[in-house]
Amino acid sequence: MERAIQRSDAREQANSERWDGRCGGTITPFKLPDESPSLLEWRLHNSEESEDKDHPLGFKESWSFGKVVFKRYLRYDGTETSLHRTLGSWERNSVNDAASRFLGVSQIGCTYSIRFRGSCLTLSGGSRTLQRLIEMAIRTKRTMLQLTPCEVEGNVSRRRPQGSEAFENKESE
């Protein structure tokens, strides 16, 4: 009974991300604060007159464990310094620490999601596959942030699947 109460309290506290777990730390898997732009900044950047449409202010990412979701918007300008900073927004240990608050004896769903330049990628699995999910999330984040706008558009929205290309090649022979 006590464990169920603690888990319920942890969920409520995680939703507001104000809970101090140990030594003043928070329960969130993220090491950087949310950097969401103000409404005015967002409107100026995305206005018709803006010449910087191919370079978003940043990206959104989230980790979820069961019904508890942790979200962040991080500034990213495409530089090597910015890439290094944002790749360190969470680490294996911080994700494991946050997840351990919600993972009990039964398996729950774990999900990592990243949205950048209009493309969204979500990785999910059960709590027993969390370590593999973390490895995949690290690679996915690095790859996605290093793509140019043309690569994102070309690979995601305008490119035909490889299977159809192979099929056309066989027909022409």
Curated annotation (Swiss-Prot):
Transmembrane segments: none
GO-annotated biological processes: symbiont-mediated suppression of host innate immune response
Composition skew (Basic and acidic residues), residue ranges: 1-21
Example of a GO cellular component annotation carried by this entry: virion component
Gene3D superfamilies with a match to the protein in the record: RNA silencing suppressor P19
Origin: domain of life: Viruses
Keyword Transferase assigned: no
Disordered, as annotated region: 1-34
Any one GO molecular-function label of the UniProt entry: RNA binding
Protein keywords: Host-virus interaction, Inhibition of host innate immune response by virus, RNA-binding, Suppressor of RNA silencing, Viral immunoevasion
Subunit structure and binding partners: Homodimer.
Entry's family note: Belongs to the tombusvirus protein p19 family.
Function: Viral suppressor of RNA silencing which binds specifically to silencing RNAs (siRNAs). Acts as a molecular caliper to specifically select siRNAs based on the length of the duplex region of the RNA.
Name of the protein in question: RNA silencing suppressor p19
The species this protein was found in: Cucumber necrosis virus
